[in-house]
Swiss-Prot record:
SUPFAM superfamilies registered for this protein in UniProt: UBC-like
CDD domains reported for this sequence: UBCc_UBE2O
Catalytic activity of the protein: S-ubiquitinyl-[E1 ubiquitin-activating enzyme]-L-cysteine + [E2 ubiquitin-conjugating enzyme]-L-cysteine = [E1 ubiquitin-activating enzyme]-L-cysteine + S-ubiquitinyl-[E2 ubiquitin-conjugating enzyme]-L-cysteine
Regions of compositional bias (Acidic residues) in chain numbering: 59-88
EC number of this enzyme: 2.3.2.23
Ranges annotated as biased composition (Polar residues): 579-596, 779-800
Function field: Accepts the ubiquitin from the E1 complex and catalyzes its covalent attachment to other proteins.
Natural source organism: Arabidopsis thaliana (Mouse-ear cress)
Enzyme's top EC category: transferase
Domain UBC core: 850-1010
Skewed-composition ranges (Basic and acidic residues): 31-44
PANTHER family per UniProt: (E3-INDEPENDENT) E2 UBIQUITIN-CONJUGATING ENZYME, UBIQUITIN-CONJUGATING ENZYME E2 23-RELATED
UniProt similarity note: Belongs to the ubiquitin-conjugating enzyme family.
UniProt protein name: Probable ubiquitin-conjugating enzyme E2 23
């Protein structure tokens, strides 16, 4: 899990191991042969009792140990090159930290080389080492979770999942004197610095997320001198010794930490609070850490007036920012440094006895230099009381050498010139007075404490609708990638579109999940009555049990515990207090018993003011907050001003999610009309915005409802259209602007190893280019060369060479698919690709001779070497276009399906790979094949890869692409195609998700079949009809087998069951419910094309 606050450790951890409560071991879940251990787990060594944090688990490619270690080393080297002293320091550090007693490398960054074996983990121990450990040699004593995390029971990892709704952590703290403070709630802890990277902050009407923080560090030297290093760079002011846990970029410094400057210039340019700079003074103790400068990524604005239309500067003074700190207590972990205000600790650092600044000087020059600097200190001290411009040595008070220091000096009315010893005494009095004041203030400071142990308990909302409170975190495991159909209680959902895919305007019901049966994959949903306007009270229809495969997450109402939200409508209809419209909201506000009472004791639960009366005052910070409760379709929000209120789903909007790259109204003019304004990175902090943007909000009121929603409201009913209605409702009543930044995130996909799949394609011999047809026929290939957009046709034989010609077999020699009596050619030339996706691409541009030769070669390879189950059509008048269909292989959830792809060969082909488009019909049935037609494959350079996984202009071909799609994409377990999911292979979570993915994939495969029979792509009408006529019987036979519970993808080519015993009852009830709805439609469609369906009449009556 992501941990925002991994503070650096210290070497002052003597006796830490003995401080760990041995009873914690009894709570461990590590009793099995291969315990569940995850990155960031807190573990205890069974032999030594040491406590540490897991930094890497075998197979965890996203572990911290993989993060740019080389880049960090490069940064260190650059810094060292700038300073010889730092170079020497680095050499000493490398010599001291080569190997520890166990033969393991010290934690200096060089240990992170070499992959871990299957039963190994890497642990950061409190004794400054990070050795590789056997997974069975440690015991998990704590596990961290955040609000909104998905979890499962460690004893039943394939059972129901839950969502963390509250976190309570108690910690043991190591004090500087070696004492241990046990069982301290993290709610009582204070950060060593108020702001951290990743925090959300508010500045006026703007909400932002902190990207970077530069510290102001106050350093106390051993001789009592003190300075403040402004906007310090961690590479120039380094901890001594090196941190015992991973370096934390968020909190590199803490009070009580020893630091050393990389060069004397670090302190020379600092602000001196006491004493003077000396070039040989490089080490000191940190007494205070504050944020000096904060860099903020501005996300959203919800306000009125000019301040809300232009984002503030990226760099901000901390005093201008308000921290949104609802859940900071959940971010503590072993190794963090903290302050404990309730302890009232005042630790005094033993210092060397002060050396008088007024010692006798060896020369008059030294004396004058010293006097001048001391006078600067004096001037700072008295600047608020005396005119600073007139302060000179002569203007200081008259005091005899026998006078004791006192605080009632008088200023001489006229200059008096006196001998040096008396002059010296005058200066001494003020300087000593100042030193005493600073010493009294700074010598005693609150030192940080180290978190050496933690115990986490969480409240979990389970899929079955129950809420379990204060469960021990080590009895749960994190679910990092919940399946697409792992819905949870109180989640908003909508019905999927109809099976035929034709009626895009068909209303879809929206509802709230009350509970989910994880085993059966069914959900109990309370459907919402359609609403015409957002301000109407929500009413529920009947509660219905449906298959989870019939549902998908609500596209607009996607809320989770812990989400940061802003109020969409700070003003609403001003309803009378007695209006029935208020009773619904007030009733929901009174029923909050499911929340943690402790965390809400000091907060005042209010009836949402903005729900009842207009208001434009954002100074109370009641427009931004965190979701702390979900119940009966309503959302409880703890606002930044500390108040709590319950709002409807239309009233707030989630911000800050990484995948949040579209406005609520979509990428259409609707978005602009609703006064959602995209904030591009290039515009960030700009002093002005274009006039057309400024004029958007003023034109909103003139837009009618029809104008606003006409373009982008298909497929929505009243319940689904609530967010659009809410925005329109807001803009009718106010001219405010809700702006937010857009962050583009590429869709993730999977990488493929194509080495084995390519063997067949690479073995193709293209040396038959000189073969030609004896009988020139109209089907011979014509190519376009040096033509305008309309193009003139020329025979390929004349263009390429007299030796090279087209390579189609004689039409009297068709090559049908093996095992089928269908006469449909595997490769053929067609005319007029009218429905081709790339038809609009200009294919008549001038092409080089090499292009034609490569296309000629590719066509010949396809004509001679296409494997079973792949059919291709080229086009006589558009040689740059191809269309292919792949038949789904048996033993996969794609069995007997047809999958169509369009290809375009650009003018610089083969230097670049072809472009591809998948005819999805609107369904996502593979991680690499997107609804919008994107094909994600390393061979097409749409995903990363190495070696022969990527396109090679010299050896790659269209055939390789097709074989990759057939064998690597449309495989038996497509779930693991998703990027990073390969590490889940063999795990309970992975196999559970894979089974569910296969069930949904087969259902989508059936829908795709019906779609293709209704709308066959051009030039493949004959193939589609003949394929489903011949395979229809086996398709229905597979449906019948799966309805009986046999495992998806376990059937032979003739849809027979391989093992009658092992596969029974493998499919879920939810899958059977959904298939029972699809089967009758599929039966009818197959009957219409002439398939033999009589044996499966019972499917039509499901």
């Amino acid at each position: 899990m992501e941990h925002e606050q991994d503070d650096p450790g210290t070497s002052t951890n003597v006796g830490v191991d003995s401080s760990v409560d041995d009873s914690m071991a009894s709570l461990s879940i590590c009793d099995s042969e291969h315990p569940n251990i995850y990155r960031q787990d807190i573990v205890k060594n069974k032999k030594t009792g040491s406590v540490g944090v897991v930094s890497e688990v075998a197979g965890d490619s996203d572990s911290d140990s993989d993060i740019s270690d080389e880049e960090e080393d490069d940064d260190d080297d650059e810094d060292n090159d700038d300073d010889d002293e730092d170079v020497e320091e680095g050499k000493k550090a490398s010599e001291e930290n080569v190997v520890n007693g166990d033969g393991e490398k010290k934690a200096d960054g060089n240990y992170k080389c070499g992959a871990l074996e299957g039963d190994q983990i890497r642990v950061l121990w409190m004794d400054n080492t990070e050795p590789v450990q056997d997974i069975n040699d440690v015991t998990v004593i704590d596990r961290g979770f955040l609000h909104g995390d998905y979890v499962a029971s460690a004893s039943e990892p394939t059972g129901q999942v839950g969502v963390v709704v509250d976190v309570n952590i108690s910690v043991d703290l190591l004090a500087p004197d070696g004492s241990i403070h046990k069982d301290i709630s993290t709610k009582n802890l204070k950060r060593v610095r108020d702001f951290a990277v990743g925090d959300y902050v508010v500045h006026g009407p703007w909400l932002g997320r902190i990207d970077d923080v530069l510290d102001n560090v106050t350093v106390l030297f051993d001789d009592g001198s003190m300075c403040k290093v402004l906007r310090v760079e961690p590479l120039r002011l380094k901890p001594i010794p090196k941190n015992n846990l991973e370096e934390d970029a968020n909190f590199p410094y803490y009070p009580g930490q020893r630091v050393k400057a990389s060069s004397s210039s670090v302190f020379k340019n600092s602000r001196w609070l006491s004493g003077l700079w000396k070039p040989n003074r490089l080490e000191g103790t940190v007494t205070k850490v504050t944020a000096g400068s904060i860099f903020v990524y501005w996300i959203a604005s919800a306000g009125f007036g000019p301040d809300s239309s232009v984002s503030p500067p990226e760099e901000q003074n901390p005093s201008n920012l308000t921290l949104l700190s609802c859940f900071t207590h959940a971010n503590w972990q072993v190794g963090d440094w903290c302050l404990l205000p309730s302890l009232n600790q005042s630790a005094t650092i033993p210092l060397h006895k002060h050396v008088s600044k007024l010692r006798l000087y060896d020369s008059q020059a030294d004396r004058q230099q010293k006097i001048g600097r001391d006078l600067e200190d004096v001037q700072d001290e008295v600047s608020g009381k005396v005119e600073p411009a007139g302060i000179t040595a002569e203007a200081l008070p008259k005091v005899t050498s026998d006078d004791p220091p006192q605080r009632n000096p008088s200023v001489s009315k006229e200059p008096v010139h006196e001998p040096w010893p008396l002059h010296r005494k005058k200066i001494r009095k003020l300087v000593i007075r100042k030193d005493k004041k600073v010493k009294k203030k700074e010598e005693s400071f609150e030192q940080a404490l180290l978190v050496v142990n933690s115990r986490t308990r969480v409240d979990v909302s389970w899929q079955d609708g129950t809420i379990e409170c204060r469960r021990e975190a080590i009895t749960l495991i994190p679910i990092e990638t919940p399946g697409d159909h792992e819905f949870v209680s109180e989640q908003y959902v909508v019905e999927k579109t109809s099976d035929d895919g034709d009626n895009t305007t068909e209303p879809r019901r929206a509802g709230v999940v009350k509970n989910v049966n994880a085993k059966d994959r069914t959900a109990s949903v309370r459907w919402l009555n359609p609403l015409r306007r957002a301000e109407e009270p929500r009413e529920f229809e009947k509660e219905e049990i449906v298959s989870v495969y019939e549902l998908e997450g609500h596209p607009d109402y996607d809320y989770c515990y812990g989400d940061v939200v802003v109020r969409l409508s700070p003003i609403a209809v001003a309803l009378p207090a007695s209006s029935p419209g208020n009773s619904f909201e007030e009733a929901t506000q009174q029923d909050n018993g499911y929340q943690d009472s402790e965390s809400h004791q000091e907060a005042k639960i209010l009836v949402d003011k903005e729900e009842n009366e207009p208001s434009t005052d954002l100074s109370k910070l009641s427009w931004v907050g965190n979701i702390t409760g979900l119940k009966d379709g309503d959302i409880e929000v703890t606002w930044a001003d500390g108040t709590i209120s319950t709002v409807g789903p239309h009233a707030v909007y989630v911000v800050g999610r990484d995948d949040d790259d579209e406005s609520v109204a979509g990428e259409s003019e609707t978005s602009d009309a609703a006064s959602w304004e995209t904030l591009n990175d290039d515009d960030r902090g700009a002093p002005e915005i274009p006039e057309e943007d400024l004029g958007r909000s003023s034109s909103i009121e003139g837009n009618s409802d029809a104008d606003i929603y006409a373009e982008n409201d298909s497929g929505r009913n009243g319940a689904l259209a609530l967010p659009l209605a809410a925005i329109e409702f807001v803009t009718r009543l106010a001219s405010g602007i809700f702006s937010r930044a857009r962050k583009s995130v590429d869709s993730s996909s999977s990488d493929y190893t194509v080495e084995n799949v390519y063997k067949q394609a690479e073995s193709t011999n293209p040396s038959d280019e000189t073969d030609s047809l004896d009988d020139p026929s109209p089907s011979k290939v014509n190519v376009t060369d040096n033509c305008e957009s309309k193009g003139t046709q020329a025979n390929a034989k004349n263009i390429l060479s007299g030796e090279t010609s087209t390579f189609l077999e004689d039409e009297d020699k068709p090559v049908p698919s093996e095992g089928d009596s269908c006469s449909f050619r595997r490769f053929d030339i067609s005319q007029d690709p009218l429905d081709h996706h790339f038809l609009g691409v200009d294919g008549q541009k001038t092409k080089e001779r090499q292009w034609f030769k490569k296309v000629d070669q590719d066509w010949k390879i396809l004509q001679n070497n296409l494997p079973d189950g792949i059919f291709v059509r080229a086009y006589e008048d558009r040689m740059d276009l191809l269309r292919a269909v792949i038949v789904g292989a048996f033993g996969t959830p794609y069995q007997d399906g047809l999958f169509f792809f369009d290809f375009h060969l650009p003018s610089d082909y083969p230097s670049v790979p072809p472009s591809a488009y998948y005819h999805s019909g609107g369904w996502r049935l593979n991680p690499n094949l997107y609804e919008e037609g994107k094909v994600c494959l390393s061979l097409l350079n749409t995903w990363t890869g190495r070696g022969n996984e990527v396109w090679d202009p010299k050896s790659s071909s269209i055939l390789q692409v097709l074989v990759s799609l057939q064998g690597l994409v449309l495989n038996s377990k497509p779930y693991f195609n998703e990027a990073g999911y390969d590490k889940q292979v063999g795990t309970a979570e992975g196999e559970k998700n894979s089974l569910g993915y296969n069930e949904n994939t087969f259902l989508l495969n059936c829908k795709t079949m019906m779609y293709l029979m209704r709308k066959p792509p051009k030039d493949f009408e004959e193939l589609i009809k003949d394929h489903f006529r011949k395979r229809g019987y086996y398709i229905l036979k597979a449906c019948d087998a799966y309805m009986k519970g046999y495992l998806i993808g376990s059937l032979t080519k003739d849809a027979s069951v391989i093992d009658e015993r092992s596969s029974a009852n493998s499919t879920s009830v939810g899958f059977k419910l959904m298939l029972a709805k699809i089967a009758p439609k599929l039966f009818s469609a197959l009957s219409e094309v002439g398939a033999d369906c009589n044996e499966f009449q019972h499917l039509q009556q499901q």
